């Protein structure tokens, strides 16, 4: 038997789920069942909290204390980029491995880099901006009508100025 669960203890559980959908509660059950929470209720709460990320795979952080779950959405860089593209949500089951052939501005890239700054491994914001540009390249979108890697080269050569913070 595992040790008895202390209700005042704060537990943090990370889950990957699709925005706006109630994931399989059977996947939630082994993680949050022992903590005294109903998987169905938590599944519904996650679906509510991730409503504006419809159709995107995102990480959700559950902070559990006193049998209460607080839900926090932790979006990845690619999820933020796809959201900035403002594409209509697509049906995930019909189309697989979608290339997002949109266009976003460099300012939006800088804003995303600021949001991701605390999770970045780069020392400066310019490094984080390059990380986000690399993700934009993987997603398949353009930045200001150009290929993201051309902008990374411009940042390295000094042709494009990055904000300091």
From Swiss-Prot:
PTM annotation: Ubiquitinated at Lys-48 and Lys-83 by RNF14 and RNF25 in response to ribosome collisions (ribosome stalling).
Keyword field: Acetylation, Cytoplasm, Isopeptide bond, Phosphoprotein, Ribonucleoprotein, Ribosomal protein, RNA-binding, Ubl conjugation
InterPro entries documented for this protein: Ribosomal_uL11, Ribosomal_uL11_C, Ribosomal_uL11_C_sf, Ribosomal_uL11_CS, Ribosomal_uL11_N, Ribosomal_uL11_N_sf
Localization per record: Cytoplasm
One Gene Ontology term of the molecular function aspect: RNA binding
Domain of life: Eukaryota
SMART domains hit by this protein: RL11 (SM00649)
Main location: cytoplasm
Cross-link Glycyl lysine isopeptide (Lys-Gly) (interchain with G-Cter in SUMO2), sequence positions: 40
Any one annotated GO CC term: cytoplasm
SUPFAM superfamilies: Ribosomal L11/L12e N-terminal domain, Ribosomal protein L11, C-terminal domain
UniProt-listed Pfam families: Ribosomal_L11, Ribosomal_L11_N
UniProt crosslink position (Glycyl lysine isopeptide (Lys-Gly) (interchain with G-Cter in ubiquitin)): 48, 83
A single GO BP: translation at presynapse
Keyword Signal tagged: no
Modified residues (N6-acetyllysine): 54
Phosphoserine modified-residue sites: 38, 165
Protein task: Component of the large ribosomal subunit. The ribosome is a large ribonucleoprotein complex responsible for the synthesis of proteins in the cell. Binds directly to 26S ribosomal RNA.
Subunit annotation: Component of the large ribosomal subunit. Mature ribosomes consist of a small (40S) and a large (60S) subunit. The 40S subunit contains about 33 different proteins and 1 molecule of RNA (18S). The 60S subunit contains about 49 different proteins and 3 molecules of RNA (28S, 5.8S and 5S).
Family per record: Belongs to the universal ribosomal protein uL11 family.
PANTHER family, per database record: 60S RIBOSOMAL PROTEIN L12 (PTHR11661), LARGE RIBOSOMAL SUBUNIT PROTEIN UL11 (PTHR11661:SF2)
Protein name (record): Large ribosomal subunit protein uL11
